[in-house]
Amino acid sequence: MRADLIKQRPDVVKAWMNAELDAQLFLADPKNADEIIKMAKAETTGFSDRALWYSLYGTYPASEGGTKTRVNLHYAITPEARGLIDKATAFLFSIKSINVEKLRPEAVMPEFADAVLKERGMKAPIGDVNAMPDSMAPK
C-alpha cells in the first residue's frame, strides 16, 4: 500500500486489512471450496474446474512433494514471514536486483494487521488451506 495513502487515510488501511482478513478466513474454510473455484474460473480461461481444484486442494503423494497443508495463511508478519522477507531481501541484494541489504523500517508495517487481529481477538497465522481427498474433486 502506498505510504501517502497510509498517512492520509488510516480508515482505508483498516478497511483493506479487514477485507484481506475476511478473504483469508473464507479461503481457509473448506466449505467454501466450490465457491473459491467458481471465483478462480471467472478470472481465468482454459482451466477446468477440476484443474483449478487440484491446484489449491489436491492431494499429492509425499514422493511428489505433497503435504497436508497446501497454503499457510499468515495474514500478518509472523516471525516466519519476517524471516522470509529478510532472506529474500538478502538474496535480491546479492544478485544486485535491489541496492539495499536491508529494507528500511517503514517498508514492512505489521502494526495494521496486528491491530485488526487484536480487535478481532485472533492471532497469526489465521489458518491453512489443507489438501482434500480426491473424492471431493469436481468430476
Name each model-derived stretch.
Residues 9-100:
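Secondary-structure end/capping motifs
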Residues 86-139:
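Conserved C-terminal helix/tail region of periplasmic/extracytoplasmic solute-binding proteins
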Residues 1-11:
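A bilobed periplasmic-binding-protein/Venus flytrap-type ligand-binding module shared by bacterial periplasmic
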